[in-house]
């Protein structure tokens, strides 16, 4: 980690944090005196207060999805179609989470037609080009790895009592075996992403996807050079390449 910058921006993946908090207490939910489930509010507040106390951000915002379809849904109707609707007990807590953020004067950013990831990415890119900022994207979403740079990091909340993990550019490259952060999405395109209902190429898992991107650099270059592949792998890429674009 570098010395503390003059400006530290923390961008919360709000909906993901709410889901995470809700299911962390799923088997033993926290309820108030009226029997109302408040697990998500409690867990969300704990994470937020921990960040404020220990990370001391100078700037902070919380990004959320909306129910409106995005360009991704229009381009690929099956996008996230495998996801179940929000649990009612979590849905009931969302207004309380918004009230908590409003009471703490933390901006709530949500725009119809855009996912929280889009807003997080926009903020991260703006801050990345602004002198004096270090940006921390608070999320478990591996898609956000493509935004990591020398001044932008993925701040992953801890699991089961473990401390959080900060993914910097060096760690990202080591984990994925890549040279550039944007190659994360190329690997995910090939191997698929079940959380977003992205199928990927049949028979191509993480190991093969890493090898292909390591050799060709991008999905686009891979599809332009299938003559360099052999056997079953060549057949799979040539017959199913459109599934990765």
Where are these regions (language model features)?
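Noncatalytic, basic helical substrate-engagement surface that gates or grips nucleic-acid strands
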Residues: 2-138, 142-170, 243-245
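Non-catalytic nucleic-acid-binding/docking modules located in mid-to-C-terminal regions
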Residues: 3-6, 56-61, 129, 149-153, ...
